[in-house]
Amino acid sequence: MAAEPRRVSFRDGRLASRKAEEAALRRHQAATWLESVIGPFGLSRCPSEQEFVAAVRNGIVLCKAINKIQPGAVPKVVANASCDSQPSTAFQYFENIRNFLVAVQELKLPCFEASDLEKDNIDAGSVGKIVDCVISLKSYHEWRQRGGSYGHLKHLKSPLATRSASHVQSEYVCSGSSSTPKRLDLVETDTERQPNQNVGPNCQEAMERLQKVILDCMISCKENLDNDSLKKDPYKLVGTILSRQLEKEQSSNSQVENRRRLLQAQESELLELKSMFQEVKIDFRTLKTQFQDDIIKLGDNVQGLSKAALGYNQAVKENKSLYNLLQELRGNIRVFCRIRPLINSESISSIEHIGNDGSIMVCDPLKPQTTRKIFQFNKIFGPTTTQDEVYKETQYLIRSVMDGYNVCIFAYGQTGSGKTHTMCGPSGGLSSQDLGISYMALNDLFKTSTSREDVKYDIHVQMVEIYNEQVRDLLNEDTSNIRTSSNGLLNLPDAKKCPVQSPSDVINLMLLGEKHRASSPTAMNHRSSRSHSILTVHVNGKDMSGNVTRSSLHLVDLAGSERVDRSEATGDRLKEAQHINKSLSCLGDVITALAQKNSHIPYRNSKLTQLLQSSLGGNAKTLMFAHISPEADSYVETLSTLKFAQRASCVELGTAHANKESNEIRELKEQVENLKRALAAKELEKSSFKLKENTVVRERAKQVPERTPPRPRRLSLENTGIGKGSIPDRKGPKSPLSVTKLNRDHATIHDSIDGFNHHIMHQGSVMQMSATSSEDPVREETEKIITTVDTVPFCGLHPDAYISSKQSGLDTLLRTPCRSRNLNLEVGQTDEPSSSAKLEKMTSSNATKKGSHLRKSIQSSIGKLIHGSERRNVQHLGQATPAKIANSTNNDVPSSITPDLRLRRRQSLTGLPPPPSTMSRRSSLGGKSDIGSDKRGAKTPPPVNSAAKAKRWL
């Protein structure tokens, strides 16, 4: 009995040493592997339990190792450079170790507890768990490197698991002892250590010792089983083993056969899959070829469609440009329609359809049975259209202002439809996205003027309003003297014209104008404009060559038409509404008259139409914005606005022309203006002089009836200025002749004159005129009066002939009535006396019958030769009395026939300036004066044969 305890203690010591060796070997493997994975970290190749635990206590080494095996397993590692045995911080302990254990559990590897790393609780069991965890990581890493093949991963948790059964049995045989002494030894050892330890660690040690006792019991039981199997019959045992082995072989053979069959089936399936793969490959190639062909065809089709689309777009663009060109050539008023968004989302809209071609369909939602109305305009802007999109459609029209064209844009519609918003923008602010057309237009004009460096532009701005039919300046405090020009154009000479240099100046002027503009809230609009606002931009450009362009841009914000029952206007608002509706009604009348091409356009019925006359009926490009409200209760106003806009679109203003003037044309115009002014001054001087002369004539004419009227004289061919006071007929008044007889007499006179000229050229006769003596005071006074009568030159006379006549001595002819003189026509010395007798007989027979009618016919025939617009007052330089004529023409020798004899005779008949006063009127006709040889007195009546001679001369 004494030998058993010694045998048991020997066996226990041997087992403990073997366990220690195996534990040291595993620590060596773990340390070596950790160093190979993460590099040297200050741990020896054969560390003790304390050194190993101290190296891995902070968790940095373990986290780095598992991150090498499984990248990203521990996303955050709290680093600590110290690798000594100092205790780690709580943060490192709970962060690194916790993250490592979580990662190990995800890999389904054996792990340990965080309490195993406590310094005061280091024993073989806790260190073994840590080493087992590291070894399992090593095995997992090697398994991963092999690609995860060759079976499943197996983990060895303790050194006792590798011990073979035979080795255990030999140890048991050698020991040959029971477990009772060992148990006593364990109890004794436990009782010896119990007073020196605390309660907590004692419990844990007791559990570990209990595990060891259970393990020893299991080993002893296995040794007993082995001893029992040896005591059996070896033959039976061999037979049993062989039978079991055969069964295993048969089962393995059947499994092999099954696996072979499965392999064959899989091989056949693989062959089928290969054939299918080949077929699929062929099909894929075929489909690929077809796909490529389809892509090529599709590309061709797309290219054709793109060409067609490009051609279509180009055709649409050309059509649009041609349409715009046609509109410009016709001068139609362009009409854009803009729809205001619904104020209340629950309201019913009267707009049913908006077409891309500029068509709009409206219907009364309150009366669905009514007929739908369709209107066509140049452009329709929906409720979601921005200010920038609206301006882009009008930008080309506004930029033409810089080219010299006049442009007018006005907004029309009922109150509250968004006219002021379109033209001036919102009242709250001036953001770049909400700017009105007025601001964006001026900004664009400044950009264009800056880009054109070869042209210098001067831009001025005027802003006025029409409030209750009164024009007021919005840029000036004093608006009492504003008036329109007399020609009715959009020209306000008294309105303040402000130069602008930048968009900021424009914004300041706009704000000033909006501040002064009349506006007040109504039941339909909280900011209702109570006046028509007109913004005029004057652009004057001058290029390097001196060419000048003058144009103007008129931006008109009309006040909205309103119904008094809806707007609830009273007092001043009612008066304003009445004036607004009246002016808009006048505008409608003007548009209707222009559309119907009436001869009379009522521009002067309103100040608004007066100011818009140059845009509606002049040389300007005009655009109208028709604003409508989509609400159902505004359907009547909407329909009225659309009808008005449709009438306006039919108005043709004609082709607008650029207001360009070259330097040469401007200089010529200035010269023409200077000449006109000089001519006007000259005409003024002449009119004043003529007024003085007429005054003298009237004063002298009053004295003529008081004197004794002169005796009737014969008709003088030189004097054609006779009037109604001609020679009275002694036999009484005669009945007037018919028009046919007068024309016949007129022809007879011309034939007689031509015959007389022919007779003079061939016979060389001389015409002589007898003048009355200067003793007759009445005749002298009449001659003085007649000198002031207008003498008109012959319009058909060549200037050279007139100059030659002046140089030859022709002077102004006195147009004297027949009653003021006693003129005798005599034929000079001729070789044929019968001709003189015949002439006297013809004159005496016709003088008593056709005297007055002949004079009228001569006057009418000669008056037709005179151009009325060239008549002027020519005063005779010197009054030639009969005495002077007698003294100056006392030569009895017949004069020779000169080449310009007929020209002088025509001048005497038509009132052209005669030769100088030194020659007598008889000598001017080419004859010889017989004043000196005339024996008759001043008041002696002419002989009877004188009439016959005159008739013969005719």
UniProtKB/Swiss-Prot annotation:
GO biological process terms, semicolon-separated: microtubule-based movement; microtubule-based process
Gene Ontology CC terms: microtubule; microtubule cytoskeleton
UniProt keyword annotations, A-Z: ATP-binding, Coiled coil, Microtubule, Motor protein, Nucleotide-binding
Polar residues bias: start-end ranges: 831-849, 886-898
Top-level lineage group: Eukaryota
All residue ranges annotated as the Kinesin motor domain in the record: 332-651
Pfam families with a match to the protein in the record: CH, Kinesin
Compositional bias segments (type: Basic and acidic residues): 697-709
PANTHER family (UniProt xref): KINESIN-LIKE PROTEIN KIN-14L, KINESIN-LIKE PROTEIN KLP-3
Family: Belongs to the TRAFAC class myosin-kinesin ATPase superfamily. Kinesin family. KIN-14 subfamily.
Protein name: Kinesin-like protein KIN-14A
Biological source species: Oryza sativa subsp. japonica
Gene that encodes the chain: KIN14A
